[in-house]
Structures are given as structure tokens and as C-alpha cells.
Amino acid sequence: TVYWSFVVTATSLGDPLVGRVLDGRYEILSRLARGGMATVYRAHDRRLTRTVAVKVMHDGLGDDAEFARKFDREARCAATLSNPHVVSVFDQGVDDGRPYIVMEFVTGCTLRHIITREAPIPPLRALEMMESVASALSSAHEAGLVHRDVKPENVLISERGQVKVADFGLARAVSNHTATATQGLLIGTVSYLPPELLTTGRAQTWSDVYSTGIMLFEMLTGTKPYTGEPPITVAYKHVNEDVPLPSEVLARKHPGQARRDPIPDYVDALVTACTRR
């Protein structure tokens, strides 16, 4: 497994960027993952002869000069972060009208993969991983940077077990370019969306704390606190309902594990504190 996803050669077939060299330096080797705003590639840095991850924004986002300036500013800010639990940003630029950002290539898997395979995760192990996430977010917040899109897909676990948070700086640039949540567009993954991003369209440092609390809840219980269709239903619950205690959800859905490895009261209290509206 590699940065953000498994390498599947078939996903690279027909991708026009595979085989290209961005700015005469970054040779695109294969596609790793595709999201709503960008595609992530494995690439070779010809200048420093190393493997990197390159995130290329989709066509159209680079046409707006204001977005290009914000993207550049946010990428530069993210590049200043120095923390072992932050995926390092090496470079950024624009190639053929498409903004891109060059990042550390992490061999491993995402927290989403861990949750899918192992959840409910024992409390001590979950807390150990969340401590690393908190360290990364703390460094960002001290630098004045809010992540805005904390979710399991943006948390990487290396082959050595090191936890790293990816995508600092990108969510803000994209969301500022498109629209605020109050204008009808749900920025970020709705399952982890902080209430204030929905009600005011603005994210603060505690917005990342809220999303981290939701992520910890899912790790502990194997389920998200709010589900439903359409996504606006889940968004409404984030704004109007309190997150249930993880211990109660675990006891109801996985009674055997709740007896073998119960969630302590202080962990319940931590989730409640993180997700307080």
C-alpha cells in the first residue's frame, strides 16, 4: 500500500498526466487516488531523485487568479509546518493551468483502511493514534493554519506505524474559491463536518477538534455517530444533536468487545469535550 491508497495499475490507464513531467521536474508515474477536487499521483522528482506524491487540482480550478493566489499562500503556509506527524509539503506550482502541490510520499495506508479492517479499535490504541493527530493539528494551529477537512482519508499510517496528517492548507483554498457552506455547498466530508462550518461558513481551530472527536468516536465504535441520506440530513444532526457516548454505542453494537475492553469514562468525556457544540 502507498500514499492514500493501494496502487492499482489499471487506474492509471487512460490518465493523460501519467508519463508527463510537470515543470520539467516531476515525472508522473501512476495515479493513486482521485477525489472531488484533485487527483493524487506517485511521481519521481528528477532533481532530487526521490519518490514524491503530487496532488493535481482538477481542470478549471486554476483559471481563477484569486484562487491561484490563495492556493499559493496556503501551500507556502503548510510548507512551514515542521512536525513528524504532518505530511511534509515540498513544492507547489502550476502546470498547463493546473495548480499542483508536491508532498512527502508515505508508504503505508490510511486510517480509513484501519477502521474498515479493525474497528472497533481498543481505546488505548485509538488514543495513541489520536495523540499523533492532535500533535499535528496543534502545530498547524500555532502557525495559524486550520485544516478544515480532518477525516480518516487524510490520516496516513506508515509501514512503521507512524501517524501523519495530510492535506493541510488545501481545503481552505478550495472552499474559499467555491462557496461557503451557508451558500449551499457542503465543504469537506459531511460525516466529520463541524457545526460552525455549516452555520457560518467559517472554520476555527476548534472545528478541527470537533472533526477529530468524530473520528475518534468512529474508531472506538466502528460506526459514525450520524448517518442518513441525503447528506443534508447528517449535516442537520451535526448542528442540532449531541454526539452519543461511545461506550453506550459500543455496548449496543458490540457487547462482547464492550465487556472485554470497555471504553473508560475519561474517553467518553474526551469525545464529548471534542464534539461539544
Model-derived features: positions:
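Conserved short submotifs of the Hanks-type protein kinase catalytic core
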Residues: 96-110, 114
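AlphaC helix of the eukaryotic protein kinase fold
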Residues: 56-80
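Activation segment signature within eukaryotic-like protein kinase domains
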Residues: 129-130
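Protein kinase catalytic-loop region centered on the HRD/HxD motif
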Residues: 133-145
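Activation segment of protein kinases
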Residues: 11-17, 63-66, 159-204, 229, ...
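Protein kinase glycine-rich loop
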Residues: 28-35, 40
